[in-house]
């Protein structure tokens, strides 16, 4: 710990003692005063230069004596020069004139966004950025886009609305934090599906594969996904309708009105997603010892999904705060519980989530150069599981007597309640080439299970024993960027606090009698933990950059792991946080004109991670419970190549290899028993997968200024074992092996009506292959999708219905 304090002091001292002259201000468009992101401002004849951020702000070190010439330039704008006399710190705002109307409408906004993405890619973190502009109007879902990204694999258990796990460098599930605009997405009851987020509202997606930025709270074990949404502050009307196989329908309606004079922004949005998910599957599933004649095709009839989302927002832009937003969202869903062993028809889950929230942002808060962001949201959740069926319909049509359709063979009719308060407070202070960032992320959760039928099994009313959790994460980071942006260094320190009070309301289900002694006991856990990370980024040669980072991360158990679900999962009273040590080495090449190609981008990462206290779900009596495992070790690499062959042809290929093994040699029992799975591959995680594809896009093929795109994507996942391979017999190994698969997807897009409308067609799983990503969880076959998108923006800079 002393070494950490010493390192912190050494890194922060230059900030305190630096004596330099600074030129600072904003770079804006002359006509509209819109901030220009990615504009270059430089001292002519020197290496001193910098880029403006997304708010148009810049800071530049300038000579202390004499006069110097400032040059300001940005793609699509006329170059500006000014002679400035040296002296003290100077504040200057620069206004650039568009070089032409077409550039202003087509090039400028995209180039500014590209500059912002490049700044993220050059940071010391191991990060991949997916440009949302290229996804606009496509029929693909967010999960489908992510699973084609290097180092990432999304594991789905079914169609729309089914459970899924996002894997980043072998870390998956809740170890990968998911954010929207830097705020945790993970819904408290786990009901929110990432695919419910419309792909057209995405600005870009950041995928962090090691260090997680301090402003996101760092609540991930070395992996995080941040979905950055578009903020088009102008009048707009949008409508999207998508139809797909298996009864899938997605509808999105949105509208926004900007009152310029008072600076008031009002917006509303609604989406509805539903699907029957009634695709065919082979039955019995994964019974490899049966003859071919024993298999038959059956239709899933209880895998339906429906979700509705309503949003209303009111924003103020001319108050003391630069951004003052009041928003409220209402989300509800319903999902059938599909069984693979019989033809389920009745069991289902449903949930309601009301989420009022407040967002405050202020630049130059209290002092010059200090930016403040504050967000608070109070989710109010109601979740239900209903399973009261007294019969079961078998796949052959016969009906048998039963107690429910779920695996626990108990009637369930839960009405659970959950209330949360989540807040995030962030301060960022920039002075010269140094940036300090202080982030505080707080979460409080109260969970009250209620089930009248479960009350009879337990012998007491579980709603009389609510559980509580309080968690807080404080992170402090320092970022240094050299004058020419060639070197960057990021140091982060984090403190985690957990306070949980949990009642063991499910313990009585393991008993055979009901007495007063079965009333649950409360267990309280209160602990603090620390984490840190250090990252370096250095430009070795022009367009070639190396990255090195190390992090010690902690993931605090979430409410679902601590509280259980009141039905099939017991509370985990002594659950410990997961701890991981990560080492990443990466290289980036981004060069134009290489070997006659328009642009070549290449990224590769080598990673090593040692993790302990891995949280896994295991059987416990008639229920399940989350428990901590020992140690696991991960070694791997991923590489990603993107090539713009010509202005119209684009190719990509990415590959991931990883080796994940159990490194717990001995069990922590009194006898010191040896672990039979020591040094064996951790099951149920793909070790080898790759993606490749090509795209042809052009402007003016069908109508002047209309855009066209044709593409093909291919995803391959190598075979992997679902369980520990303890046998050397080929027949036994085959029973637990998930086969490899190759999924081909083809699609086309066409814009219409001056790019205010787009039509998209996509065919997924072209060859209708039987596909598994989870054991005994077949995925849909060939799927046809059609999407119509209409978007009308008052501000043409906001873009059209699709983009190249």
Briefly describe each language-model feature range:
Residues 127, 138, 143-184, 203:
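Extracytoplasmic beta-strand/coil segments of soluble accessory domains associated
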Residues 28-32, 40-44, 73-77, 87-136, ...:
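Short, acidic, small-residue-rich periplasmic hinge/interaction motif at the N-terminus
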Residues 313-332, 351-515, 521-523, 527-541, ...:
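Face-selective signature of the C-terminal outer-membrane beta-barrel domain
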């Amino acid at each position: 710990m002393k070494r950490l304090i010493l390192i912190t002091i050494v890194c922060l001292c230059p900030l305190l003692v630096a004596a330099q002259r600074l030129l600072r201000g904003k770079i804006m468009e002359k006509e509209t005063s819109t901030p220009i992101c990615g504009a270059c401002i430089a001292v002519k004849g020197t290496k001193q230069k910098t880029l403006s951020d997304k708010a148009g702000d810049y800071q530049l070190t300038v000579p202390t004596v004499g006069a110097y010439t400032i040059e300001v330039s940005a793609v699509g704008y006329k170059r500006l020069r000014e002679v400035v006399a040296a002296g003290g710190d100077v504040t200057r705002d620069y206004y650039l004139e568009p070089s032409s109307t077409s550039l202003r409408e087509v090039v400028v906004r995209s180039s500014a966004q590209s500059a912002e993405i490049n700044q993220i890619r050059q940071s010391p973190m191991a990060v991949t950025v997916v440009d949302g502009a290229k996804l606009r109007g496509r029929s693909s879902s967010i999960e489908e886009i992510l699973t084609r990204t290097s180092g990432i694999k999304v594991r789905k258990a079914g169609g729309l609305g089914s459970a899924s796990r996002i894997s980043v460098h072998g870390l998956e599930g809740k170890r990968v934090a998911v954010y929207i605009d830097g705020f945790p997405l993970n819904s408290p009851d786990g009901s929110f599906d990432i695919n419910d987020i419309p792909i057209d509202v995405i600005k870009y997606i950041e995928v962090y594969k090691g260090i997680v930025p301090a402003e996101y709270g760092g609540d991930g074990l070395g992996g995080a996904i941040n979905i950055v949404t578009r903020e088009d502050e102008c009048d707009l009307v949008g409508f999207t309708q998508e139809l797909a196989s298996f009864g899938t329908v997605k509808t999105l309606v949105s509208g926004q009105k900007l009152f310029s004079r008072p600076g008031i922004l009002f917006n509303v949005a609604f989406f509805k997603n539903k699907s029957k998910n009634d695709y065919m599957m082979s039955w019995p599933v994964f019974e490899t010892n049966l003859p071919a004649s024993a298999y038959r095709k059956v239709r899933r009839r209880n895998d339906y999904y429906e979700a509705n989302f309503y949003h209303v927002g009111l924003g103020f832009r001319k108050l003391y705060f630069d951004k003052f937003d009041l928003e409220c969202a209402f989300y509800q869903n319903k999902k059938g519980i599909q069984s693979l062993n019989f033809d389920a028809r009745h069991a289902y889950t449903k949930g309601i989530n009301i989420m009022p929230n407040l967002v405050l942002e202020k630049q130059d808060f209290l002092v010059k150069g200090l930016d403040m962001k504050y967000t608070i949201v109070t989710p109010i959740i109601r979740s239900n599981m209903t399973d009261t069926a007294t019969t079961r319909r078998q796949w052959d049509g016969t009906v048998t007597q039963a107690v429910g359709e779920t695996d626990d063979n108990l009637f369930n009719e839960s009405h659970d309640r959950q209330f949360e308060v989540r807040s995030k407070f962030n301060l960022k202070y920039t002075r010269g080439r140094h940036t300090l960032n202080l982030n505080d992320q707080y979460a409080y959760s109260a969970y009250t299970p209620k089930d009248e039928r479960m009350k009879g099994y337990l012998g007491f009313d579980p709603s009389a024993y609510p559980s509580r959790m309080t968690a807080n994460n404080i992170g402090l980071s320092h970022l240094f960027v050299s004058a020419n942006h060639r070197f960057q260094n990021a140091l982060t320190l984090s403190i985690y606090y957990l306070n949980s009070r949990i009642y063991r309301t499910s313990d009585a289900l393991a008993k055979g009698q009901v007495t007063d002694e079965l009333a649950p006991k409360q267990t309280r856990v209160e602990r603090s933990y620390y984490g840190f990370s250090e990252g370096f980024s250095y430009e070795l040669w022009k367009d070639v950059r190396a990255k090195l980072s190390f992090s010690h991360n902690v993931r605090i158990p979430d409410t679902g792991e601590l509280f259980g679900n009141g039905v099939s999962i017991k509370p985990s009273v002594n659950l410990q946080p997961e701890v991981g040590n990560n080492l990443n080495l990466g290289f980036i090449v981004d060069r134009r004109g290489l070997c006659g190609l328009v642009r070549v981008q290449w990224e590769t990462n080598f990673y090593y991670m040692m993790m302990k206290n891995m949280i896994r779900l295991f059987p416990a009596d008639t229920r399940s419970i989350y428990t901590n495992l020992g140690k696991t070790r991960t070694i791997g690499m991923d590489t990603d190549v993107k090539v713009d062959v010509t202005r119209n042809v684009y190719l990509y290929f990415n590959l991931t290899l990883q080796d994940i093994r159990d490194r717990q040699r001995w069990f922590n029992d009194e006898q010191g028993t040896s672990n039979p799975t020591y040094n064996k591959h951790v099951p149920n995680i793909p070790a080898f997968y790759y993606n490749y594809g090509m795209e042809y896009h052009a402007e003016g093929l069908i109508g002047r200024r209309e855009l066209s795109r044709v593409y093909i994507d291919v995803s391959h996942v190598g075979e992997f074992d679902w369980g520990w391979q303890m046998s050397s017999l080929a027949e036994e190994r085959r029973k637990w092996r998930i086969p490899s698969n190759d999924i081909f997807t083809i699609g086309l897009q066409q814009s219409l009506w001056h790019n205010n409308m787009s039509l998209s067609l996509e065919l997924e799983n072209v060859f209708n292959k039987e596909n598994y990503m989870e054991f005994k969880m077949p995925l849909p076959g060939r799927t046809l999708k059609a999407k119509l998108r209409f978007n009308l923006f008052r501000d043409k800079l906001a873009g059209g219905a699709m983009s190249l």
